[in-house]
Amino acid sequence: MKKLLFVALVVALLASCMRKKCNYNRKIEFISVREWRNAYCPHKGKIYVYKKGEGFTQPIDSTNVYHFEISTHPFMFYKDTTNYSSLVCSVDMIDDLNYLHDVRLVLDDTLYYDVSQPKLSCVEGPWVMGGPTEWSIVSSLYVNGHYYDDPTVERGLPISHKFVRIQRK
């Protein structure tokens, strides 16, 4: 009985030491357009989901965005917090919106953000009773072909407003 208890304890300790892997299947819950330096808040938005690497040709899913919020509170990993402002778009009702797909965000039918190649990284935090805390962050991605490496917490998608593509009707 003691041997069985000892083996169970060793297996439990070894299992708790495994590093978690970043979950690319996790649903994206919000999109944050960073460096949103004006008080204007869009009236409507649309998110399109595309197969990864297909060049934004055939959307596989889409949804409307109805809830926008201008935030002046920086995220945990934001480098420059002076005059911080971002537009946060809450996302729901779309199952295919995850880090395995390319995403296009369209605001007011004129502002286009094509997001591709998101890279998730695991970050270790302070030690607690069970060991170090770990969580995933979006460490880099491409916005309209421009490399962007301002990290944000997982379940979010950071976009820089300076890479916007404007298309007039």
Predicted regions and their residues:
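C-terminal motif of bacterial Sec signal peptides marking the signal peptidase cleavage site
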Residues: 14-16
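Post-signal peptide N-terminal segment of mature Sec-exported envelope proteins
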Residues: 25-43
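Bacterial N-terminal signal peptides
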Residues: 7-12
